[in-house]
A protein has these predicted regions:
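Long, contiguous binding/interaction regions
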Residues: 1-68, 72-97
Length: 97
């Protein structure tokens, strides 16, 4: 099955208005979130992993003590697609703002 199409710059800019905790460009979406404790950060990774497995769309996650750096991109499309936006919304539902 081919990947969904890469979003145009205008589509991405419009989508980012609805995702105020995320930044991004055609190369990917990014969000940094600080959790209260290291254990909370690890638990957040597990929750994100569950959603990612369900969606079969996997983020890049970097953990630094209690801070998560998240990056989303659809590599097979060469940029941001609706899959990335959907995953960003699902992550936002899991993590504090």
């Amino acid at each position: 099955m081919p990947p969904p199409p890469r979003l145009s710059p205008d589509e991405l800019a419009a989508a980012l208005h609805g995702l105020p905790l995320w930044s991004g460009d055609g190369d990917g979406l990014r969000r940094t979130v600080q959790l209260p404790t290291f254990r909370d950060a690890v638990a957040a990774i597990v929750a994100i992993a569950d959603v990612a497995e369900e969606m079969d769309h996997h983020p890049d996650i970097d953990l630094r003590w209690r801070t998560l750096h998240l990056a989303l991109v659809t590599h097979s499309a060469g940029g941001v697609t609706e899959n990335d936006l959907d995953l960003a919304r699902r992550i936002d539902a899991l993590l504090p703002g």
